[in-house]
Structures are given as C-alpha cells and as structure tokens.
Curated annotation (Swiss-Prot):
Disulfide bonds: none
Protein name as catalogued: 3-hydroxydecanoyl-[acyl-carrier-protein] dehydratase
Pathway the protein takes part in: Lipid metabolism; fatty acid biosynthesis
Protein's UniProt keywords contain Lipid metabolism: yes
Functional note: Necessary for the introduction of cis unsaturation into fatty acids. Catalyzes the dehydration of (3R)-3-hydroxydecanoyl-ACP to E-(2)-decenoyl-ACP and then its isomerization to Z-(3)-decenoyl-ACP. Can catalyze the dehydratase reaction for beta-hydroxyacyl-ACPs with saturated chain lengths up to 16:0, being most active on intermediate chain length.
Name of the gene: fabA
Molecular function (Gene Ontology), one example: (3R)-hydroxyacyl-[acyl-carrier-protein] dehydratase activity
Species, as recorded: Shewanella sediminis (strain HAW-EB3)
Amino acid sequence: MSKANSFNKKDLIACGHGQLFGKNSPRLPIDNMLMMDRITKINADGGEFGKGEIVAELDINPDLWFFGCHFSGDPVMPGCLGLDALWQLVGFFLGWEGAEGKGRALGVGEVKFTGQVLPDAKKVTYKLTIKRKVYRKLVMGIADATMEVDGREIYSAKDLKVGIFTDTSSF
C-alpha cells in the first residue's frame, strides 16, 4: 500500500490524537498549537538533497488567537510559532516514514526572519527539504526550510533537528 502524499486538517488532527500513523507514532500538537491547515506535498525522495520534502499551508485570518495578544495594537504572528511549525513538520515526516515514539525539537543551526505575518495576510506556506535521516537507536530528522507569507519568503531555517524518543523520562 502506498503512503498518502497530502493531508487535510482532519488528518492532521487525527495525527495529534495518535490515530493517523498509529498510537505509538509521533503526534502533532492539537488546537491552537497546530500551526498548519494542510500538507499539500510530502515525499521521501524529493527536495534539494533527494531525501524528502514537505510543503504545508496555514490559512491566515484576523481572528487567529495570537493576533489578539501579540501585540496589543500591533498584531503580528510570533516568529517562534512559525519556527515551531517547521519542527512540527519534521516530526510529522518521521512519523509518516514509520518512526515510533515521541517527537522533540532538538535545535536549529540558523534562523533568519526577514518579514512578518500580519492579520491581513492570506496564507503561510512552509517548505522543507530533508537533509538527513537517522534510523538507529536515535531516530532523527534534519531539514532546511523556508516560510512564505502570500508568496514572499520571510523566514529561513537551516539544520532543524527533531528526535523521536521511545522514553522521554530523562530528556
């Protein structure tokens, strides 16, 4: 059976509840912390390094929760939420490939912010290319990524790292 190469919001919520890839697979956050509405493309051999790629989208509207509190009178999407979305997608990729355990962000080599997401924007697009996949005692994905708002690149990240752990008690 071939794997799906796109996912809708219902699928992403199912992943957050452990119902998409299995109860032991990495989960996406749910509710407000789920920072995407759909994954439009995912594969295991595309991207700049031939190890996989993901493209996902978040619909923007002025009623999103963060605009009401960040900042009063100057609403802007927090940069950390865009960065978290990129980590979420690396973890999702590892679960899609069959990894089991709990996903944890392990770091990022470099992040640059060159723009902002304002309430009048329409869509954020995340584009990730997988650089390295490790499937040993440690399961880890490393990716480079960009984030666009309405077609304009505003964030870039290099060496996003996510690990999948079967035991997080000592983490």
